[in-house]
Amino acid sequence: MRLRFLLTALTLAALMTGCTVRSLNPLYGEKDVVFEPALLGTWAEHDDASSNWTFQKSGENGYRLVSSEGTKTLDGRLVKLSGRLFLDVTPKDGDDSLEIPAHLFIKIELSGDTLRTAMLDADWFDKTADLKTLGLSYIRINDKVVLTGPTKELQSFAVKYGGDETVFSHLQDYRRTAVDLAK
């Protein structure tokens, strides 16, 4: 139990610190945000049912994501671009006043009671010789890529590379364990 908690905490820390590609700007404009009621509820990792995320409705078109350990709460917006769904998440206000609330993009596929996620691959970005050829504005902070481009630029990238599993990798499958009846 303690090991599972530690592994989940480390995964969450990696998500919101430096092991992922973050962006200063969102992947969405208000017209791009969609709400999918089927996401509401609790989703457990296929490999570890004790590690899960609960999606709750937040505002008109948003989500509040809470980890099973309650160690991290994220705000999320679901974005539909060229038929693909992306979840744009940021730390919940007040989680860390010293942290810039960067955006993290997660490609998702939802099929019944199965949710598959894929994250932008930081290693792929690091190995790409010239990010400028990708049409992305960025800076490097402590050798990590931080995207700085406007929303339209980020969306063009997501549309172009959303189907590439070398760009959106780190696949994780979840299964629904509870449905939110307050849809």
Positions of predicted regions on the chain:
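Intrinsically disordered, low-complexity segments enriched in polar/charged small residues
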Residues: L7-A9, D180
